[in-house]
Structure formats: C-alpha cells, structure tokens
C-alpha cells in the first residue's frame, strides 16, 4: 500500500526550514561587473550635472543657476553628447568597482551567515561596510580622482587633457601615483558608509519580504523598488561626505590641507547648505543606479546558477 502524501500546506512550507543558498564570490564578481557597466551608461548625465554643481563654488561668481541651467548651458555649448563628457573615465572604473563591491560582500557574508545561511541586518551592514572600503581603496579613489579632474579640465577655457588615457598619463607625470589618490580618507568614509547603508537597508527589506523562507524568489520589480529605497537612504546619509570628496579630488584640491580642513573651510565660507549641494540630481541618479545594479546583479546571478554549479 503506497504511503500517504504529505498535506499540500506542509509540502509548500518545506523550503522554509532549508538552508539559504549562498552566492559564490566568483559569480558575484562577474554579475557585479556587468551590472556596473550597464548602470553607468544609463545614469551618467545626472552624475555629470551633480559634479558640475559641486565644483561651482560660491567663492566665485556662480556659473550655473541650478540643475536646468547647467543642462542648458552644457547642451548649448557641446550638444547633447556634452552631458557624457568624462564618461570613459567613469565607465572604466564602474565595472571593476561593482565587481569588487559584490565580490567582497558575498565573500564576507558567506562567512558571517548563521547555521541556516541567513544574514541579519547588522551583519549585512558590516559586510556592506567592508565591501565599501574595499571598492574605495582598490578602484573608486583613483578612478574618481581622474574623473573629477577630467570633467573639471574639460570645462576650463583651455582644456589640456585630450582624452582619458592622455589625462591619466599627464596626472601621473605631473603628480605621481599620489595624484590619483587625492581624498582617500573622504572616499573611504563615503564609500564605506554608502555601502553599509545600502546593504543594511537591502538586507532588512529582503529578510522582511522573504519571512521564514530565505530562498523565496524575488521578481525584478520588487528588487528594483528595494534598491531605490536603499539608494535614497544612502544619499541622505552621506551627501556631505560626497561633497567633500569631490572638492578634494578637483583641480583646486591644493587649497585644502586635508579632508577635515576641506570640511571646515566649506562650513566656514559657504555654510551648512553647501554640504547638500547637488543633492537633487544625485538623489535621482543614485535611486536609479542602485535599483538597476541590484536588478541586473540578481538576474545575472540567477543565470550563472544555471550554468555554473558551485554547490
């Protein structure tokens, strides 16, 4: 006589007691790099506007009256493609940045999960912090320094950099490798807090959505919404650090003795509001940025799980 079947409700609940599936760091590196490259091609114009507004210091007569005026002046002077000036430097950095970030996050989280393979919010924050520090030191600081110098140079009356690689050669020739690591402290603080906030929020929302089933599938729409929320939280949490980082990496960084001096000078000469200059364009870019990255990352990991067996 055949054994009776388990009730449907119990069968459906079975996965809840299973162990959460882990993501191999190698998969995370590939998926993260692809996601980072696609995302930056979509969102770069808002990054360009944000950087222009932050470099438009109050100590000089303002060049732009706001976001719209910055876009109008750029398009009038250089055409629509002017909003993509400096894209190459950011694109070259975005792919390895996302690869390092997700690879490090998965590496750390795989060692910090509980016996069931679950990651709580606090550990998600710590893993995000580690991922942010890693991407800051390995990729973000040198690439962001070059990007800001390149954009700043292109808006000067007589640009001296003919392209990305020429700009890198000139910066290294004139300032040495140290010239590509300006604002390292601010960058580590910014990226560390950035990813700590994002992964804390993302981990919290995912745990809430999945409940007792850590392997519950998430469709791209849900992932995108959660990513946008995480992005918004990070913007309001560390925009002042982003402003300081941008100033420390600009062509006039020599005006500041160090990161702390930069912050004090901005506060003294321009007031507290200067720390939130460029917040609106950054908010739109980051929300879209984080949503796109997490959606593409998750979907690529799903694909890799089918063709790359690591269990």
From Swiss-Prot:
GO biological process, one term: mitochondrial citrate transmembrane transport
GO molecular function annotations of the record: antiporter activity; citrate secondary active transmembrane transporter activity; citrate transmembrane transporter activity; tricarboxylic acid transmembrane transporter activity
Regions that span the bilayer: 29-46, 86-105, 129-143, 183-202, 224-241, 278-297
Gene Ontology CC terms, in alphabetical order: extracellular exosome; mitochondrial inner membrane; mitochondrial membrane; mitochondrion; nucleus
UniProt membrane topology term: Multi-pass membrane protein
Solcar repeats: 23-111, 122-208, 218-303
Pfam families the record matches: Mito_carr
PANTHER family to which the protein is assigned, alphabetical: SUCCINATE/FUMARATE MITOCHONDRIAL TRANSPORTER-RELATED, TRICARBOXYLATE TRANSPORT PROTEIN, MITOCHONDRIAL
The family this protein is said to belong to: Belongs to the mitochondrial carrier (TC 2.A.29) family.
Name of the protein: Tricarboxylate transport protein, mitochondrial
Gene behind the chain: SLC25A1
